[in-house]
Amino acid sequence: QSDSQTSEWYSYFENDVLEKIKKIYKKEAYIMAKKGSLSITSENIFPVIKKWLYSDHDIFLREIVSNAVDATQKLKVLASTGEIKEELGDLKIRVKADKEAGTLTVSDHGIGMTREEVEKYINQIAFSGAEEFLEKYKNDANAIIGHFGLGFYSSFMVSKKVEIRTLSYKEGAQAVMWSCDGSPAYEMTDIEKSERGTDIILYVDDDNKEFLEEQRIETLLKKYCRFLPVPVVFGKEQEWKDGKYVDTDKDRVINDMEPAWTRKPTDLTDEDYRKFYADLYPGIDEPLFWIHLNIDYPFKLTGILYFPKIKNNIDINRYKIQLYCNQVFVTDSVEGIVPDFLMLLQGVIDSPDIPLNVSRSYLQSDSNVKKISGYITKKVSERLQEIFNSDRKQFEEKWDDLKIFIEYGMLSDEKFYERAQKFVLLKDTEDKYYTLDEYKKLIEGNQTDKDGQLVYLYATDKEAQYSYIDTAVSRGYDVLLMNGQLDPHFIGMLEQKLEKSRFVRVDSDLIDKLIKKSDTTSNTALDEQQRDMMTSVFKSQIPAMEKSDFLVMFEPVGATAQPIVITQNEFMRRMKDMAAIQSGMAFYGELPDSYNLIVNTDHPLSQKVIADTESACKSELTPILDELKTVNEEIERLQEAKKDKKDDEIPVADKEALKHAEEKAKELRAKESDILKTYADQTPLVRQLVDLALLSNNMLKGEALSKFIKRSVEML
């Protein structure tokens, strides 16, 4: 084929392999019915299969064993309908490796094939023996029809030659052998075979000798076949004898034919569910609880999903949900089938409506898959509501582990949000739990501000923010604890959803400003000159901190409140919190932390500092401030004079005068700051008050903390 045709081949393999191959070859008139030659006769078919049919070559063993299971299940159906009268005998599937011969053999005692069936199902690659069988036994066989055809040809990914030895269950059937070396040519001859069923013999090529190693085969069988409904035998059971392990006569069956999800929930105990979880994920903590899925319409789905205890070091790539099709392992990449917010769940989903060979684009577009995702969301919310209703105490005890699942679901799925409103919990700093409605009723009488907005106070660290929590509680307010990974986003969502409500962290402002009850004025307010002077005093005593900015403010808070309080701007802090867990917000993450250092002008110690500063510095500052006042008036006059004028219309003398005045003002302000800093440096009380505020916020560290302790001892 030309390069363009080969490219077309590769692109088609992404989605529905069987249908696409049919279309390509029908379009190019490559389908032929020539004896001794496969119906798809391109020389390139096998290289394409080897390279592109499956991303993982080890999938071949799943396909071959799955076909053996299908053949065995079909035999059981025929026996149940009376079409087979003979004894079924041993129905085990056997996998055997022969390193000397270089072969891997998968044998079954299923329905086998006649010469005509080999022609139809093996030689005509793009057709499936399941369709005809399904039509004939559609009332009974739907759940056991697998995918035949290209699945068999996956064996050529690891083999230089493949043989089929088969004898049909049909009376008088002749056993046949089919063989192919990976070219379009094949051979088929009559052979002697006494036992019904099929042997698939793979002559493993030199690049894939690993698939003859016992440990490698066992690993693959446990990965793909551990829950198949027909016993799969690989080797013999062993026992300890004469100082070593030796084989016994007992077959080693590697699979559990009736895993927990295939049984009725009424037949399972809690211990059964826990044991199955331990088998799936050895060595991790017991799950919080589980959900048993079972639906027949409009699609078939069974499974068990477990809610694990989430730890910071959990390996989400190791403990994934496993997807099965008729108990055959398909993948543990279940994006699109399981909603994103439930990807941290663990367990098993089994659905014959999801084919064995699926691509991500298929999962994203298939209507059944979308329905399955919606159904899982619904079942999870129903189960959570059920536990909440029946045992709220248990639900609250597990809330810290459940919280991340539920908040993520409410953030990402509108329908889940609607259902979860009834059982999502808010936890306060006293470790009490409330639903949204319960908490609203608790605080609406006391935490509604003058504008009618309900104010939800919250903390993110009970220890670090203790003084702020204590102040709020002393006013009769309740404070929520919102310290989860998703809480910044969850808070933002609740503010959008809940009417006339806002969330504020308890340290983001003074408590009387967080829940403002009225507009009040105070007699202790400072004038502009006092504010400028005291700003220099207090700012000079704030120790240098990396990526931190402080704005000094003066507020009358009451004589019994702290002399200085440090708060953090709510908006900027939220943006930085979200930047830590959300891409596209890196700009906010790089900004410095923004704090307000609020001096309580009602407190006696603050008033003492203000009065002492004015008294001690008055003689030095008065001439500077008087001169600065004159200079500022001159600057104001010159700026007014150049207003609405173009640059070339302003006299050069005025430009020079303005420049000189601005430089003079800068010089005078620097002198003022130096005087105030010198005074503050010599007045331990100023630095002590600042350090106390920093200490209460866990912001005093290293050398600054050591100096504070030494100064405290001296002052005592």
Task: Please describe what each predicted stretch is.
Residues S2, K20, I24-F211, T219, ...:
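GHKL (Bergerat-fold) ATPase N-terminal catalytic module, capturing the glycine-rich phosphate-binding loop
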Residues N15-D16:
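Acidic/polar hotspots within intrinsically disordered regions
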Residues I144, V162-A185, D205-K209, Q215-L716:
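GHKL/Bergerat-fold ATPase module in large chromosome/replication-associated machines
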